[in-house]
Amino acid sequence: MKIGVLGIQGDVYEHYTAIRPLKNKYKVEAYIIRSPEEINEMDGIIIPGGESTTITRFLSRYINIINENVRNGMKIMGTCAGAIILSKDTGDPRVHGTGIMDIKIQRNAYGRQIDSFIDAVNIKNIGTFNAVFIRAPVIDDPGKTSVLGEYNGKPVIVENENAIAMTFHPELTGDLRVHEYFLRKVMGN
C-alpha cells in the first residue's frame, strides 16, 4: 500500500513520519507527493495541516487529479487546513474547497496561534484521543458525513465513503491510531 502526503506546505514531514512506523503492520510505504502525476501511483493521500490560503494557491495543479482519483475510490485524509481543503464550503473566498466532503467549515475558529490547545476527544472506533488544536477550524455543518467525534458539541472528525477530515493535528501527538484508522479505510476494513 502506498500513502502519499501532499508536499505543498504544512505538516508534511510529520505525517510522513507518522506513517513510517506502521510499515510492517500494514505493509505501507509513505511518500511525499511533489508532483500531480505521483497521485496516480498512491492508494491514499493525506492533505496536511498548514496555512489553507497558501495550500489553496498551489493546489490548482493537483485538484483535478485528486478529485478524479477520489471519485474512483482513492481514500483521502485532511487534517486542519487539509479538512478545509476537503470541504464544500470554506466560508472564505480566498480558500477554495474541493467539495470532496459535504461539510461547511470555518477557518481559525478557535482563535490565534496563542489560543492553541490539547484536549481529549472521544473518537468512534478509536477511543479517547488527545487532540492538538492549532488555529483550528470548526465544522459548522457536517452535511452528509458521519461524525466520528465532537469537541464542545461541534464535530471535529468526520468521514464519508472515501474521505476523513479532522480539525486537529494527529500527526503531532505520537499516537498513531488516527493514521491507523485511515490505513484500515484505505485497505477497505
Swiss-Prot record:
One GO BP: glutamine catabolic process
Catalytic center residues: C80, H169, E171
Residues reported to bind L-glutamine: G50, E51, S52, R107, I134, R135
Keywords of the record: Glutamine amidotransferase, Hydrolase, Lyase, Pyridoxal phosphate
InterPro entries the UniProt entry points to: Class_I_gatase-like, PdxT/SNO, PdxT/SNO_CS
An MF annotation (GO) of this entry: glutaminase activity
GO CC terms: cytosol; glutaminase complex
Annotated family: Belongs to the glutaminase PdxT/SNO family.
Protein name as catalogued: Pyridoxal 5'-phosphate synthase subunit PdxT
